Structure formats: structure tokens, C-alpha cells
Design a protein with these regions (language model features):
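Phosphate/pyrophosphate-binding betaalpha-module
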Residues: 142-151, 155
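A generic, well-ordered mixed alpha/beta core segment in the N-terminal half of proteins
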Residues: 77-79, 85-144
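Conserved "HGTGT" condensation-loop signature of ketosynthase/thiolase-family condensing enzymes
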Residues: 1-87, 152-315
Length: 315
């Protein structure tokens, strides 16, 4: 567990597709017209989305980026010739909280004064890589999720603001004992439960100390399992929301997935709700690839968590 004394969220910028903009988020910074964003390929569209976020945030001392493309290809291209130190994280959908932990360590140790976490995913890119190309027309199962299209950049520094990152726990890799890549919520549910228990133990806190537990992309299926596991342990959170489960309106599948679900819902739905003063962000990740699934391996999962506290009268 890592404790932070002076790590604050100062600004954020997002670029989303119309599907996310028409969902349960409010006032994203920029909405693209279609999946191609006036580019020839969707890969280049995602690169452009990342670039738009970076262009609308202060120049950082370091960038930590994560996405779902092979070898972090989209952020690698975005960072070309910027002359900014760059750290790529490839931890599936668990990366947002992990990026905040990494930046928090650097800022608190005075290695840097500030940095940006840039998270992105693109529905057409991820579906092609992990499932089937959209053109194939494969039907969506009710337990399945679909990747959100979004890039979101978050600028952190040691300059005080209303939102403080106070601590974080890096998760352990657990075996889900499931082989179904369409049931990522089921794959990740126990991981979310285990990391939450570890975090409560490490911080010597109770589940009732938190106004909200926000998980990343368990979806409706995984969120139900997660709460059942907590209840079996005698734990009843004040409030639990899964970002993937609520991101879209009238969604017939289990919801949205991808590393952007958590920050998108947090910054554009949750953060201005005055009921929530102390929030746990659990970034959930299914650590599979096509080879693993084709070879019928059970899918590992990991969850990373950070605590965000709202500082009243911080001025």
C-alpha cells in the first residue's frame, strides 16, 4: 500500500464517441463525429484522440499512458518527438488506478512535480484484436461487454486542489478459473473483491468509511458477483457503482468495458455529486490475449485501487 501526502488532480480532458456522449455522462470535453475522427483508420483515430487530450492539458514532466492496442501502439505514436519522459502501462483495464499510483509515487518522492495519465480505448480496434472484427457481425452475448471509445487525460501535481489522491494498493494476479473471454465481469469479480479486502486491511479502514466504491468494468454480471462476495463476508458498502454497467443507456449486454470506463464515469458523472467525499476507485482488469483464449487457459485477473478524497474549502 502506498500513502501520498501531496498528490492532487488538477485538470482533465476527454474525447469520446457519440455512443458514450449519449450515455450516462455529462459534458465530455469533445465528441467525435464517428469512429474514424476524419482519419483513414480507426487506429489513427485513437492516436488523434490521445493527441487532442494532450494538447488540451498543461505540458507535463512525465506521461504515463495505457491502452489496449498491441505494444501500446497508439500512445507510442502519440508520444513521438514530444521529448517528454514516457512510461507505458499494459495491464488491460486495471491501468487507470495503477497510473495514478505510479504518478503519486513520483510526485510524492519529488522526482517530478506533475504528470499526466492518459488512458484510451477504441471499440473497433479492441473488438478486432480481442474478439472479432465488427464487420464479421458476431452476435453479442448478454453476459458480454463492449469496449468504450474514449481517450481521457488526467493532470496530477503537488499543487493543492479539491481532489486529493491519498493512497493506493497494487493488486495481485488471481486465477478466475474461467475460460470464457466474453464473461469478463465474471473473470474480474473475485479480483475486485480480493483487492478491496487487501486495501481495507492495509489501510486499517472499514468498508463503511467510504461513501462510494466505484469499480471499473465488471458490468452488470460481474457487479452482481462482486456484491455477493462482499455480502458473504459480511460487508455491505454504503454505495457501489460499476462504471461499465452504467456508462450506456438501455444497454442489452452486460455494459461497457475498457480502461476508460472508470475515469470517464468518475470525472463526468460522479465527481460533482456532493454526497461522495471519500471514494475508492477499483480498476478491474482481465489479463487475457487471443493466444491464451485459443489454448483454453484459465484467465487471470488483477485489480488496482486508489482512494480519492474531496477536500472541502481547499482554497
Amino acid at each position: 500500500m502506498f500513502k501520498f501526502k501531496n498528490v492532487y488532480i488538477n485538470s482533465v480532458y476527454s474525447v469520446v464517441s457519440p455512443k458514450e456522449a449519449n450515455g450516462n455522462i455529462k459534458n465530455p470535453n469533445e465528441v467525435i463525429d464517428d469512429y474514424y475522427f476524419k482519419e483513414k483508420t480507426t487506429f489513427k483515430a485513437e492516436v488523434k484522440m490521445i493527441n487532442r487530450c494532450l494538447a488540451n492539458l498543461p505540458t507535463p514532466e512525465i506521461v504515463i499512458a495505457s491502452n489496449l492496442s498491441n505494444q501500446l501502439g497508439t500512445s507510442n505514436i502519440s508520444m513521438k518527438n514530444r521529448n517528454i519522459p514516457y512510461l507505458g502501462l499494459y495491464t488491460a483495464c486495471s491501468s487507470f488506478s495503477l497510473s495514478l499510483i505510479n504518478l503519486g509515487i513520483m510526485i510524492d518522492n519529488k522526482n517530478v512535480n506533475n504528470g499526466i495519465s492518459i488512458i484510451s480505448s477504441h471499440n473497433l480496434n479492441a473488438e478486432k484484436q480481442f474478439r472479432f472484427p465488427i464487420e464479421y457481425g458476431a452476435p453479442k452475448l448478454k453476459r458480454s461487454t463492449q469496449t468504450a471509445t474514449c481517450a481521457i487525460g488526467v493532470y496530477l501535481s503537488n499543487k493543492p486542489s479539491k481532489y486529493k489522491v491519498t493512497n493506493g494498493t497494487i493488486g495481485t494476479v488471481v486465477d478466475s478459473y474461467l475460460k470464457d473471454a466474453y464473461n469478463m465481469g465474471g473473470v474480474m469479480a473475485y479480483s475486485a473483491y480480493k483487492t478491496l479486502i487487501d486495501h481495507l486491511t492495509n489501510t486499517k479502514t472499514s468498508i463503511k468509511d467510504y461513501d462510494l466504491i466505484l469499480t471499473g468494468d465488471l458490468g452488470k454480471t460481474g457487479a452482481k458477483i462482486f456484491i455477493e462476495l462482499l455480502n458473504q463476508k459480511g460487508l455491505y458498502p454504503k454505495k457501489h457503482i460499476d462504471a461499465g454497467a452504467i456508462l450506456y443507456k438501455d444497454e442489452e449486454t452486460s455494459g461497457a468495458s475498457g480502461p476508460t470506463c472508470l475515469p470517464l464515469v468518475f470525472f463526468y458523472n460522479i465527481i460533482n455529486n456532493k454526497k461522495y467525499k471519500k471514494i475508492l476507485l477499483l480498476s478491474t482488469g482481465s489479463l487475457h490475449n487471443p493466444e491464451m483464449v485459443n489454448q483454453k487457459e484459465t484467465i487471470p485477473a488483477i485489480t488496482n485501487v486508489v482512494t480519492i478524497e474531496v477536500i472541502e474549502n481547499w482554497h
